[in-house]
Amino acid sequence: MASTALEIVAFVVSISGWVLVSSTLPTDYWKVSTIDGTVITTATYFANLWKICVTDSTGVANCKEFPSMLALDGYIQACRGLMIAAVSLGFFGSIFALFGMKCTKVGGSDQAKAKIACLAGIVFILSGLCSMTGCSLYANKITTEFFDPLYMEQKYELGAALFIGWAGASLCIIGGVIFCFSISDNNKTPRMGYTYNGPTSAMSSRTKYQGGEGDFKTTGPSKQFDKNAYV
């Protein structure tokens, strides 16, 4: 019962993390920068992995998609690959979790379901690591440019999508670890012992081996006949 509750908690936590990680891909605010005037904000720049946008003081946004993938910076390509891998791994991890949980009717025997649930935990951990790496790589590029005094282009700050990605990655890792611990809890189930109360077998003294060679001692028919047997 305890292992089933752990699996349910792990599934809810992992799925929540996967949803958060997936929501970062279409989110616009991976990095944000504002240009302030004397009274109001004159422009707001924001970008994600696919496009860069600018919003003027009237609230009208103009966006421009990034050029060909071969013309992109290396860190953007790496972040794209890592985030797509995180979403894909989380999808397969959720399927494995459904087959491996004890509360479901699919997956085979308890031993097979335990192995599938452990595999789901490993996949969720990998998904969280991919998301954590992608968001951290993007954030490192932003902070490096922001604190570089020689960088003269537009400087950005961390956007909301990065924090959502970090939170989702943490939940995926925590859920995967709980899945793995639930398997170790299954292996600690006590085994019931059985005692045999049947009759003990005993060899009759007539059938015991006699002699060193292990031959049975048999008594042949009597060679002495009564005289009355013959007429």
Curated annotation (Swiss-Prot):
GO terms for cellular component: bicellular tight junction; cytoplasm; endoplasmic reticulum; plasma membrane; tight junction. The chain crosses the membrane at residues 1-21, 81-101, 116-136, 161-181. Pfam families: PMP22_Claudin. GO terms for molecular function: identical protein binding; paracellular tight junction channel activity; structural molecule activity. Residues 22-80, 137-160 are extracellular. Residues 102-115, 182-231 are cytoplasmic. Keywords: Cell junction, Cell membrane, Endoplasmic reticulum, Ion transport, Membrane, Tight junction, Transmembrane, Transmembrane helix, Transport. Expressed in the inner ear where it is detected in organ of Corti, marginal cells of stria vascularis, Reissner's membrane and spiral limbus (at protein level). GO terms for biological process: calcium-independent cell-cell adhesion via plasma membrane cell-adhesion molecules; monoatomic ion transport; paracellular transport; regulation of monoatomic ion transport. Belongs to the claudin family. Forms paracellular channels: polymerizes in tight junction strands with cation- and anion-selective channels through the strands, conveying epithelial permeability in a process known as paracellular tight junction permeability. The fourth transmembrane region (161-181), which is missing in isoform 3, isoform 5 and isoform 6, is necessary for integration into tight junctions. This is Claudin-10. It comes from Mus musculus. The gene is Cldn10.
